[in-house]
Amino acid sequence: MFPTKNFKTIKGKQILSDLFIGRPLKMNIVDNKLLMIDKYEGKQITMIDLINTNKIERIANIGEGPNEFLNLRDITYNSKNNSLAFFDGMLRQVSFYKINEHKIQINNNTFHRKVRFNADCPYDIVAFGDYFLANGCFNAKQFALLNSKADIIAEFGVFPGDNTGVEVENSFFLKNQTTLCTNLGQSRFVAAGYFHDQLVFYRFENNKIIKVREYFSMNAKMVSRHTKDGNQDIYSSSENDETTRTYRMLYSTKEHIYALYWGIANKDFGKTGKVCYILKFDWNGNLKEGFKVNNLLKNIAIDEISNCIYAVTYPDTVFRSVEQPKITRNIQA
């Protein structure tokens, strides 16, 4: 679907060993700090100073008390009010904290508010300005828009591929599962498929969700089952050897959205010579450029000011700085 043969090959330089990292899940760069959802030493987040990478802090205690989390799954930055939103998948809540004087702290002084969600949104929840976004299956729609009280006020988005079994909702979600990412001003967002290659761009304007652009060419390769219980149709899905892992994550900057793409089937996962791709789009969905990496990256964070891509390799969880060809200097440890 994209001209990967024309993508530039980029290489990385290790800046921190795996001894410093637990199991990194997701990364954000805010005020020259690299935040990593990374359960380690009783904390949920590892924070690395990108000016001095030897300066590492652990924040966000594990627990159910004030300013604690059980299972962080997403961190969203809002550039309009200079705040961070933390989504706890186990507690089903989003907690907001303000950034004061360029200091990122999770305590009573920086706490702003928190919002709890019910089982109507069983998967990912992302802060979106005064609203929230959720993925899943909502009356055959892919996404839901929620207000500040966590009430669903709109359901939208139709999966462009095979919708057989969509009425089963949670079971069907494996076939059309997506990851979500907003822009820094939280007026636009992108969704990308985990096992299919849907990539769809939306903007929020005049209290309406508007689709800007959509790419799609491949359904999820799953084993689908159809049985009957009396007059009721029952559908289920599961992975097989042909199931292909497509987009792994999205990362937003002020001007662009980056997509990390694998395109590797389960049967090929143990083979050597695997590569991945980083695609760079503007917020209207136009592909600006792409990069090829001769390794598998688990997740990425982009610093466009210093022209660096920070990444964690798979499966060694080694932290790297990946150079783009136009970079003139490395980030030194």
Where do the PLM segments sit?
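Structural signature of eukaryotic scaffold interfaces centered on beta-propeller domains
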Residues: 25-28, 74-80, 123-128, 172-186, ...
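Conserved blade-ending motifs and adjacent loop-strand segments that build the rim/top face
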Residues: 218-229, 283-303
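Loop/turn-rich, solvent-exposed surfaces of beta-rich toroidal or solenoidal domains
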Residues: 240-280
